[in-house]
């Protein structure tokens, strides 16, 4: 069935999803401009990256519902998604870590940025980076989350360096990390934890540099749950073989 044979409403819906995904390029551009702004507009940078995070969290589901790959087969939204993801999940956060966070002397900070950017390719270029039960296999280059936690929790340089190196290595190790919406096991708990984490994080960004202990505890517990869910899946072993996957959605 050719594209023209689908109802106009279906074609409009499919293109609307593609436009939503492409809007990530706008949010990425605004975030990058805020990062390099002379006044160091880091709050706005995180606002735009959080907007991009929300878009990335829903566009995959909408794409499947709108059957975009079937209705517009010649336009690969998965490639658009990968470009946007690399910018918003990896590149801009890595630059932010170099520019704004205590990451050691400048040469070391630059080396760490290079390690983050290059090691992430083993995630984005990995055709088997997601298991058949929808866990990410290897750290999924979620440097926006790592950098955001460093920022709002105001962690010291030594901690930042050690954690960065650990996650660089974990990108290459077949440990598991839960997709909050697509993993069936603990799905309700996963989604609830994401919502709680997101709201608490937005609050901390808004009131930065304040960091009430109650909000810190909420973030640590909700974020820690995802790490625990991944550990539990890793301990179960290779029950499901990895599957080809082009996007993180």
Regions found by a protein language model. Give the residues of each.
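Active-site-proximal cofactor/substrate-binding loop regions of enzyme domains
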Residues: 7-69
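C-terminal ends of transmembrane helices
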Residues: 61-70, 119-134, 172-181, 228-236
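Alpha-helical transmembrane segments of multi-pass membrane proteins
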Residues: 49-56, 115-123, 167-174, 222-229
